[in-house]
Every structure is written in structure tokens, then in C-alpha cells.
Amino acid sequence: MKVVTLQVTKLEEVKRRAQDAFKGKKQGARISFATPELLFRLMTTKRWELIRALAGAGPLTIREVARRVDRDVKAVHGDVHTLLNAGVLQKTGDGLIVFPFDAIHVDAIHVDVLLHAA
């Protein structure tokens, strides 16, 4: 099963994984974010809908994806290109859109909140 992992991680961890990859250690597909806010900004409810519509469907046109989620083609076009730029979706040689994974795993997010006395 081909899984992509979305994670919030520090730059040092990304560098360590890159070094491990250069040494030949398998890393799996990962998309890393510097902050939880960046992850949440990318993975909106509407974009999750697009991924669900594309999962297992094979390559589709943006128009067909828009039809499947009952949304405006222009809005879907923008979301698709955002997901393409992030590496969540891919474009085939003939310009169709595909979700190239079987699943998405989102690593647990731990957020430290500093409380300040008023």
C-alpha cells in the first residue's frame, strides 16, 4: 500500500531524513510542514473532498473532479493546483489529475502553548 505521510516537523528532522535517504534508507512519501497552521491551511475540508473523489479513481480531468464533488470548475482548479504544488496530487503526461497514493496518514500533532500570567 502506497501511503503519504503529512507531518509537522522541525527543519532538523527534515535534514536528518534527507541524510538518511542519501545513505539509502527508505523514507516513504512524506510532506512536511513547519507549523500546524501551514498543514491546516493546505488541507482544508474542500481539499479533503477532492482527495476522496480522486482516491482510487485513476486520472481525471479537473472538470470531472469538479462534477464529482459538485463544485465550480474554477474553484476546483485552484484547489487542485494548490495540492499539485504541495505534492499531494500529480499530473499525468496528458494533463490529467491523479491521487498517486492509496492513503494519507497525518502524524499526530503536538502543539506547545505557553501560558503567560496576565
Language-model regions, residue ranges each:
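Short amphipathic alpha-helical interaction segments
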Residues: 71-84
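Short amphipathic alpha-helical interface segments
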Residues: 45-59
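A short acidic, leucine-rich amphipathic alpha-helix
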Residues: 64-68
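General nucleic-acid-binding
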Residues: 1-19
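Short alpha-helical segments that sit at the start of domains
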Residues: 21-49
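Short, cationic-aromatic polyanion-contact patches
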Residues: 40-44, 61, 93-118
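A short, conserved structural fragment
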Residues: 85-94
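N-terminus-biased detector of the onset of the functional/mature region
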Residues: 5, 32, 59-60
